[in-house]
Amino acid sequence: MGLYTPPPTLPSTPAKSGLSTPTGKVTPYIANGFQIQGSLIYISDASFIPDNTWALLEESRKRNGRPSVAIIDCLRPMVHTSHFGLRETVSTARRIGAVRSYCVGFNHEVSHDSYEKILGAVDGQDDRGGWAETEQDGIGMIEPGDPIWIRPAYDGLQVTGLEGGIVKDNGY
């Protein structure tokens, strides 16, 4: 038996749409997070933190005190199946209560400078004069709450002082 070559009037592979239609409820993406010596919390590529994980984080805070640094996922302003959006990232950062929180994993819908403005407003640096519509929309997605220090991370950012609650970095 030799190779079969379809006639030129037939496609060599079945023609089928690449689109898929969800068949059920979309469930949030739970990924691994890391807590290092009670002072650094890293949660990336996640859109949900289960209650039992929150219980572990809260117990650790009782034992070790306030975490120094939290590094938290934020793909874009709107939530995604497998990533936090701005609202979820800020809510998570508030609940973790670290001295400083940094966001990672952005796509390119919003510029780094715009994320700096939006997240800076969360700790009271809220000078909205001349803000772009994207920035106004972004801050509007974040629920009101206690001010916290939260900024977008970037390549080359160096964070020091994880012990003792005095956190410094080479950019902010």
Where are these regions (language model features)?
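Binuclear metal-ion centers of metallo-dependent hydrolases, dominated by the metallo-beta-lactamase
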Residues: P50-Y172
